[in-house]
């Protein structure tokens, strides 16, 4: 499913950035003013933040360079759009058997 691929690409970049630090989810989440479990869900691809502010601050904490920040923003836009599409998709038609 394309939408899940876009969400996973966003999550993979978050995990890559987190992996460059020696900080726990709790240590990274604290200055972002979000719960550690929320940050973990973002990194696992289980959720996508509706706003970019926390993602931008996360990137800064992880030492992302300008090109990585642009790529993270691009992937976030695609992930948000994919989640919106998956939520508004019509239910599958029932079988006519």
Segments and roles (model prediction):
Residues 1-18, 30, 49-97:
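Short amphipathic recognition helices of helix-turn-helix/homeodomain-type DNA-binding modules
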Residues 27, 38, 54:
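Ca2+-coordinating acidic residues in Ca2+-binding motifs
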Residues 26-27, 44:
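Short, charged low-complexity linear motifs
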Residues 21:
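Flexible coil/turn residues that form the inter-helical turn or adjacent wing/linker of helix-turn-helix
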Residues 33-50:
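Recognition helix of helix-turn-helix/homeodomain-like DNA-binding domains
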């Amino acid at each position: 499913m394309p939408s899940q691929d876009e969400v996973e690409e966003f999550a993979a970049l978050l995990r890559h950035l987190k992996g460059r630090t020696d900080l726990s989810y709790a240590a990274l989440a604290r200055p972002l003013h979000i719960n550690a479990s929320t940050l973990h869900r973002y990194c696992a691809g289980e959720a996508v933040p509706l706003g970019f502010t926390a993602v931008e601050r996360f990137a800064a904490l992880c030492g992302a360079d300008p090109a990585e920040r642009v790529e993270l923003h691009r992937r976030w836009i695609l992930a948000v759009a994919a989640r919106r599409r998956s939520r508004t998709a019509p239910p599958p038609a029932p079988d006519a058997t």
